[in-house]
Amino acid sequence: MIMHFTMNTLRTHMLRPWTILTLTVCLLTGPLFAAPMTEEDREHLLVHFEMTTLMVAEQVRGLSPAQLEYKVSPDRWSIREVVSHLAVAEPDYWRDLQKALKPTPDMKEKKSSATDADILWYGIDRVVHTKTGGGHEKVDTYKNLGEALGKFEALRATMIEYIKTTNDDMRAHSFGDREVIDCWQWMLEISTHAERHIQQIREIKNDPNFPRK
């Protein structure tokens, strides 16, 4: 489940520290409102979505069935289950975004509960763990990695095309009820949510008992 984080609580396929630092600095200097989306905001979203889309595919490429089904402990997800979760969750997140963009723009009367940098940090920080809910914990929806990855990549293609072409004023529309952010930030959070699970896949692969083949 995606959580909105405060500070308290690239066009590339490699997650390098300088990439995150550069993107964070750029986001901090971005505008609060844009009508429609600025090219700077568009590029930041595009870079992050392309990065995480490629990284998911890279992390699972060439893994054996034993590796895909390996669990660090019985109560933790396997790599196949992580990808299945993304394939189940992202369609809901995408629909939520489209719904939030329909009402009259309202961010001039509201204040975001998080900065862009907070949302970027959410993708990196694996110290704070959140419990998945809303049906997104149904990680056995896709028993086959290829099917789950195909669903994930197909929707990612749709979202990336939207980022490239939309004229929606995403900064002007709020998202959420209790902890409000703007719709541009929610779109970014869809990608940083995937980034968290990429980190999770890496943790599984780095476990001492992870199958060698």
Label the predicted regions.
Residues 5-21:
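Bacterial N-terminal signal peptides that target proteins for export
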Residues 18-31:
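Bacterial N-terminal signal peptides
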Residues 30-44, 95-152, 207-213:
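Short, helix-capping/interhelical loops that line the mouth of catalytic, cofactor-
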Residues 42-70, 195:
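N-terminal targeting signals for Sec/Tat export/insertion, comprising classic cleavable signal peptides
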Residues 48-51, 55, 92, 151-154, ...:
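Charged, amphipathic alpha-helical oligomerization/scaffolding segments
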Residues 69-119, 161, 165-213:
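Short, contiguous alpha-helical
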Residues 126, 130-190:
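A charged, solvent-exposed segment within the mature domains of Sec-exported extracytoplasmic proteins
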